[in-house]
Amino acid sequence: MEFVTGQEYETGGGAQPAISETASLTAPDPTFIATEQKTNVTQIFQETFGISDAKLSNMGTMSGVNIAGQQPNPTDPRDFQTAAKMQKMARDIEYTFINGVYQKATADNVANKSRGLVNAITTNTLAAESAPLGLWLVAELMKEMFDNNAPTEGLTLLVDSTSLYQLNADAQANGLTIVPADRMYNGIRLMSLLTPMGEIYLKLGEFIPAGTAFALNLDVMRPVEMITPGKGNFYREQLAKTGAGEKYQIFGQIGLDYGPEFYHGMITGLSTEFTPGT
């Protein structure tokens, strides 16, 4: 399914009108502000697993190394396999939301592929030229976002572990403080850093390309799901049975609505090494 992430338009720069009383009696020539619709797509995530009748009959028993306190085999292998597959799918979704390469299906045998943040953010980008992540790089990105009419309040900086270390080292070297996790957003606990452009929250993330950091406006981001009537989304169902076993599939469709892409920013080319200070 294709969905809209935003309607973009330009109103031009600020200017002072010079309209006399006489001129105001005649309406000016009409102009038209064009809009451009931006879209993304949901895509399919699907996993299958099979369980033999022999495995089902082995539920709750002990196997493997005989150690005191050993946990028995899962009581219901179906529930265990379902949970494990859902964990994998959740990580695949997170990877896609960050790194996904856009593709719109043109036929039933062509896959929809949801666009991720790396490929969505094009307006506010900053090349670090192998510099480590520091306060002024973050502030410079926020300045660029502000100059491009993006809100800079409540932003969240999504970083990998190396960049988080670099940022903490820079803050320490300059007598600054990164406030420990004190804010909850959709169940996510966030740290914060005060810059000349305002406060920005910090979140350690996975699947971020090396040398990359994101400044995200979480208020305009949400997952878009496609619900299968009578089944929901990311549901488990049994497939046709063959032999002494059972086969199941987990099926779901989801994509990322990142909102107006210029509401976000991205730094690339950061140093991928961290050298502790003395």
Describe the residue ranges of each PLM region.
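Flexible, glycine/threonine- and acidic-rich loop/arm segments that mediate assembly and lattice contacts
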Residues: 1-201, 205-278
